[in-house]
Amino acid sequence: MFKRILVAVDGSKTSLKALDKAIDLQKLIPEVEIYIICVYKHHSLFEASLSIGRPADMDIPDKVLSEYAKEVVNHAKELAKEHGATKVRGFVKAGKPSRVIVKFAQDKEADLIVVGTKGTNSDKDGMFLGSVSHRVASNAKCPVLVV
């Protein structure tokens, strides 16, 4: 059935609900590996120059975002282990979240992707699905569980 489950987290409540579902599945199928990924949007030098302006600080946005993503993944791994998950690995990637999640799932041969309905940047009163979860569900080659 499932060997690898990829869970996309961003620190939002819905991404932690997605993690809970992956943990529940691992309890039913103990040999399942849970891969936790947090993707931060990489900023080009041009984008960085618009917001900061000093050449020496051009890489600060990526450093800050990368560190935040690492914290999110580490927190998610700790939560997973506290809730009984055994085989858990964490990954941090830069890029467009939906594309990176779909490609990473293909590269790691994930059998299932679990995402929250809306992430940290979603409009609370907007559509039923956030743009990342919608794009992942539309483009993934494996099943996607939206929580």
Regions found by a protein language model. Name each.
Residues 143-147:
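Short hydrophobic/aromatic patches at helix-to-coil boundaries
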Residues 115-138:
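Glycine-rich, Arg-bearing micro-motifs that act as flexible, cationic patches
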Residues 51-55, 106-108, 131-132:
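Short, hinge-like loop/turn segments at secondary-structure boundaries
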Residues 75-113:
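Structural beta-alpha unit
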Residues 56-70:
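A short acidic, glycine-rich active-site loop
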Residues 1-56:
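Small/aliphatic-rich secondary-structure junction motif
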